[in-house]
């Protein structure tokens, strides 16, 4: 960061009170003098002179800015001198005024990520056999065929777009149940990746940076979707071909288990 002190009283005596006058008097202190006379009288061998002392002075930011503006004006003037005023002169000038300090920042600000608004949509999912997902008991989803009279038993998911390893074919999402403090998560149970419904604090979830067990990579293949566990790659949200069986986490891609889903958007 840069810090700029104030001008000394001796220098202020030579400074013009007119805000439009950006220069010190030509007969001012030798340690800070800008010789800017009539350009026609400028010595062709000397050009525009700028004398700067390495001793630190007290300068307000406004006064330093005035000097910078003045130097910019001088640099842009067409002066018939052999040496043009270069940017290196400004760098030297700044090095005498400002002191560099490192500014450290974290790659990810966890607090900021938690406070960021999370984009979400509401949807229903059906497997490849058009079985709907319903809540059985408190913490279990099952897949079964529903008729028109009980279609309202389908769970509505709140699909949140979260931080993860995003690519062209994978979009990280979290799947919560609308109106409930429940999210699908993947954990290791009995040495096997397992899908479960996990209760969460509604004041903290959803958030942009979800724990990895809550994250699924949404993969779109033609008009179907797959949901791969971010915690356990190549393990997918799956249903059985048998009616009224629990939704589970499987790695039987291409086998008898169903991992393809269709999605129906639901208005909020």
Swiss-Prot record:
Spans traversing the lipid bilayer: none
UniProt-listed Gene3D superfamilies: 2.80.10.50
Keywords, alphabetical: Cytokine, Cytoplasm, Inflammatory response, Lysosome, Mitogen, Pyrogen, Secreted
An example Gene Ontology molecular-function term: integrin binding
GO annotation, cellular component aspect: cytosol; extracellular space; lysosome
Domain of life of the organism encoding this protein: Eukaryota
Family statement drawn from the similarity comment of this UniProt entry: Belongs to the IL-1 family.
Additional information: IL1B production occurs in 2 steps, each being controlled by different stimuli. First, inflammatory signals, such as LPS, stimulate the synthesis and promote the accumulation of cytosolic stores of pro-IL1B (priming). Then additional signals are required for inflammasome assembly, leading to CASP1 activation, pro-IL1B processing and eventually secretion of the active cytokine. IL1B processing and secretion are temporarily associated.
Designated name of the protein: Interleukin-1 beta
């Amino acid at each position: 960061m840069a810090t700029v002190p104030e001008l000394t009283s001796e220098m202020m005596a030579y400074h013009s009170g007119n805000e439009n006058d950006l220069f010190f008097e030509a007969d001012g202190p030798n340690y800070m003098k800008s010789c800017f006379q009539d350009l026609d009288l400028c010595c062709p061998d000397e050009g525009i002179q700028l004398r700067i002392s390495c001793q630190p002075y007290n300068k307000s930011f406004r006064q330093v800015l005035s000097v910078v503006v003045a130097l910019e004006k001088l640099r842009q003037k067409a002066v018939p001198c052999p040496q043009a005023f270069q940017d290196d002169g400004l760098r030297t000038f700044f090095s005498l005024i400002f002191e560099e300090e490192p500014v450290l920042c974290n790659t990810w600000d966890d607090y900021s990520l938690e406070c960021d608004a999370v984009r979400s949509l509401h949807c229903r999912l059906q497997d490849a056999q058009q079985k709907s997902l319903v809540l059985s008991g408190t913490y279990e989803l099952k897949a079964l065929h529903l008729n028109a009279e009980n279609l309202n038993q389908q769970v509505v998911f709140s699909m949140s777009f979260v931080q993860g390893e995003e690519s062209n074919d994978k979009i990280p999402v979290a799947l919560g149940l609308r109106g409930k403090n429940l999210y699908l998560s993947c954990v290791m149970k009995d040495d096997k990746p397992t899908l479960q419904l996990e209760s969460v604090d509604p004041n903290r979830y959803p958030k942009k940076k979800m724990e990895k067990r809550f994250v699924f990579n949404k993969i779109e293949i033609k008009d179907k979707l797959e949901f791969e566990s971010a915690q356990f790659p190549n393990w997918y949200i799956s249903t059985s071909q048998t009616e009224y069986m629990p939704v589970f986490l499987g790695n039987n891609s291409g086998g008898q288990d169903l991992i393809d889903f269709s999605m129906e958007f639901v208005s909020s």
